[in-house]
């Protein structure tokens, strides 16, 4: 657990460069901007430019990433407009950010908000070379709907989101993937930041993936203080998920209610939750997936016949060697283990979008 905590400390999204380069002035509005808003902007080199009108302010800084890492200092013109460009190119994909104006942390009014860092953060999308797999296309689309389910464990009603594939008609039964968000996020993360529904729609339309249901629940991770991952007890969420949510889903949707047709996966802390729950309740899930959230060992899982698939992934800027080594160890012990390394990404959503894209076709074969 200590090793995993170290992996998760550096949740930065801005990629620094060791050399300066001339910035191309081909900036265009980010696709995540509010309607009619020009800024923030991105260019073909993956630089981001921010602007805000704050005539009375004395300083404006943009901090990027989960928890607000680093800082791009904006400069003020004669009209009270602050503008600044990142020092270097950013990694492809989605990034959280926030503005600090005279010490007050605020969101950028030019862009949409996304839940992360235990607050609503601003979001920016850096165009990716492979963004076609989560693009909005003219294909049959599934539905993402909100559900409210009672929990005996907490005595409260909880919210989750459910993706139903285009083929869901209330008659045929489908397998289910329980897909968890990371620290500081909530049940909206995988559909809003991760585009899980679009990834699935496109894979299904291309015949690369079997249709299945995805359940995205709040993982209680916001009860964890920054830096407290190693001491967090996943047992409470284990009981909410397995004893409350799974039976609710099986009774309210057309599911194939057996272990061989259930999977669990998660990103970052959601991966840590996945590991805990799949090992604690091996009778519930047949497919395991950890995205940037740790490793499995043969000693932890036990009998290889208990699990259909073990999927491990991370960004190439994280701990790829550990992922590859763990996967080879599992294979040698008789497990169906698959690894995936997202090239050019760190601990960020582009790595996890790609991980879902790679894992989904392997499920429920």
Tell where the protein language model's regions lie, with residue ranges.
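Non-catalytic cap/lid and distal C-terminal segments of serine-dependent acyl enzymes
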Residues: 21-25, 30, 36-37, 42-61, ...
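Bacterial N-terminal signal peptides
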Residues: 5-15
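Sec/Tat signal peptide C-region and signal peptidase I cleavage site
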Residues: 16-20
């Amino acid at each position: 657990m200590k090793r995993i905590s170290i992996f998760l400390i550096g949740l930065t999204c801005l990629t620094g460069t060791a050399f300066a380069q001339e910035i191309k002035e081909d900036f265009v509005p980010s696709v995540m901007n509010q309607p009619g808003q020009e800024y923030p902007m991105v260019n073909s080199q993956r630089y981001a430019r921010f602007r805000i009108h704050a005539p009375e302010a004395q300083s404006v800084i943009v901090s990027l990433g989960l928890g607000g890492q680093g800082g791009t200092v904006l400069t003020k013109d004669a009209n009270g407009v602050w503008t600044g460009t990142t020092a270097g190119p950013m990694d492809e994909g989605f990034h959280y950010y926030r503005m600090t104006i005279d010490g007050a942390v605020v969101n950028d009014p030019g862009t949409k908000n996304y839940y992360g860092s235990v607050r609503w953060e601003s979001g920016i999308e850096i165009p990716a070379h492979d963004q076609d797999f989560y693009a909005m296309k003219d294909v049959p689309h599934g539905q993402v709907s909100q559900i409210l389910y009672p929990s005996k464990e907490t005595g409260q009603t909880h919210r989750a989101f459910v993706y139903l594939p285009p083929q869901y008609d209330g008659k045929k039964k489908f397998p289910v993937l329980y897909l968890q968000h990371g620290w500081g996020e909530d049940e909206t993360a995988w559909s809003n930041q991760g585009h899980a529904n679009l990834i699935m729609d496109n894979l299904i339309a291309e015949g690369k993936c079997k249709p299945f249901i995805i359940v995205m629940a709040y993982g209680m991770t916001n009860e964890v203080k920054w830096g407290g991952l190693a001491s967090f007890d996943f047992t409470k969420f284990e009981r909410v998920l397995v004893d409350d949510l799974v039976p609710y889903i099986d009774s309210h949707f057309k599911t194939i209610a057996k272990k061989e047709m259930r999977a669990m996966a998660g990103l970052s802390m959601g991966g840590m939750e996945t590991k805990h729950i799949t090992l604690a309740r091996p009778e519930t899930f047949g497919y395991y997936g950890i995205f940037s959230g740790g490793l499995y060992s043969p000693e932890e899982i036990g009998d290889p016949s208990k699990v259909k698939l073990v999927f491990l992934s991370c960004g190439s800027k994280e701990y790829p060697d550990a992922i590859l080594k763990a996967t080879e160890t599992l294979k040698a012990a008789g497990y169906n283990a698959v690894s995936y390394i997202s090239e050019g990404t760190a601990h960020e959503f582009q790595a996890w979008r790609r991980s879902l894209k790679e894992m989904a076709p392997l499920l429920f074969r």
